[in-house]
Amino acid sequence: MTTSFLHVDFQQPAEMRFNRARVRRAFVTIGQRHMRDARRLVMRRARSAPGENPGYQTGRLARSIGYMVPRASKHRPGFMARIAPNQRNGEGNRRITGDFYPAFLFYGVRRGAKRRRSHHRGASGGSGWRLAPRNNFMVETLEKNSSWTRYFLARELRKSLKPERRHR
């Protein structure tokens, strides 16, 4: 599966000044807000049903959600925010050791991985799921905050581009 991305290169006019630090701060703010909202979705202290957001028992999933704004290098400006459970080099997260738990929540687990006499799906009754798939809370967070993110980023880009002062 390939990921699509958009890259725009432009020459900066000599009479304009671009404040990169302000835009990077905007990405940090975006990452913090998305992390906060994703954590709130998995903080409900109730047993979750199939299709709902995961319930909160130990809090490990909620604490593992973090964000990362990569450092700028000579090849990349660092204008990006990654928000995910178990985010490597993430800010404000504690990693989950062992198997990747959010994948079990998203895909679910079928009952009876070992084949026995009655190995057919739901042969003993029930749905055939040991853990039915839950809602993808990260996608829900991104969709909920997409208009705010677009507005906030456009505002910060507008504020970061200033005309250069002319010396008389």
Regions found by a protein language model. Give the residues of each.
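Short, Lys/Arg-rich flexible segments
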Residues: M1-R94, F100-R168
